[in-house]
A protein has these predicted regions:
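Alpha-helical transmembrane signal-anchor/signal-peptide segments
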Residues: 29-45
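Short beta-strand edge/turn micro-motifs at domain boundaries
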Residues: 119-189
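Hydrophobic membrane-insertion alpha-helices, especially the h-region
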Residues: 7-27
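Solenoid-repeat scaffolds in large eukaryotic assemblies
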Residues: 48-49
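N-terminal non-globular leader segments, chiefly Sec-dependent signal peptides
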Residues: 9, 87, 91, 95, ...
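Structured, soluble extracytoplasmic/luminal domains of envelope-associated proteins
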Residues: 78-135
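Positively charged n-region of N-terminal signal peptides that target proteins for export
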Residues: 1-6
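Extracytoplasmic/periplasmic/luminal assembly and interaction segments
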Residues: 52-98
């Protein structure tokens, strides 16, 4: 084989290796994960959503934030509701995950013991009227990243910016775990 052919083959191998490295590096960035979350929401791909969003953590944190806002608004009934939410956090979060799965799979919602608290919290948070419109920015700090996401509330006809905390696991996979400014969003809403 001539030196020119060997150099050409070596060059092609180097280019393929560099392209592979860039691709696999990109797959392990919070920007890629945020794009996959948006893709999962748009295509109703529950498996991809569950891979990139720790739904149990997100819902548990949302319940905590809701209970905190309710308990501090000064109304006695809201303090009682907040206390009830906190005590039932785990089963309500599990039910929210289950309902998300059913919604993404296009299945009919099943009746549950927790229908009333789940409906109350989703209505209170306005989750059913929200759409993700744009990923605005990503600030990566070690094994955590804060992704600013613009969401649109169809009922209020208003845009909000959520600060979503993403964490990297031991395998290098980025996963959304919490909406950092959910309390601010609830107060605005």
């Amino acid at each position: 084989m001539s030196k020119l052919k060997k150099a050409g083959i070596l060059f092609a191998i180097l280019i393929a290796g560099a392209a592979s490295w860039v691709y696999f590096y990109w797959m392990n960035t919070p920007a890629y994960a945020a794009g996959e979350i948006q893709k999962a929401v748009q295509s109703h791909d529950y498996d991809l959503l569950a891979y990139r969003v720790d739904l149990n953590k997100v819902y548990s944190a949302a319940i905590d934030d809701s209970a905190d806002v309710l308990s501090k608004d000064g109304e006695k009934d809201h303090r009682t509701a907040a206390s009830l939410l906190r005590s039932l956090k785990s089963p309500i979060a599990d039910e929210l995950v289950h309902q998300t799965q059913l919604r993404f799979q296009g299945k009919k919602k099943e009746s549950s013991l927790f229908d009333e608290p789940v409906n109350a919290i989703t209505s209170y948070l306005g989750f059913t009227t929200l759409t993700i419109t744009q990923c605005l920015s990503i600030e990566e700090k070690g094994d955590q990243a804060i992704v600013s996401v613009r969401v649109h509330d169809r009922k209020l006809k208003h845009d909000f910016t959520w600060k979503v905390l993403m964490e990297k696991d031991v395998n290098g996979t980025w996963c959304a775990t919490r909406i950092l400014n959910l309390k601010d969003y609830m107060r605005e809403r």
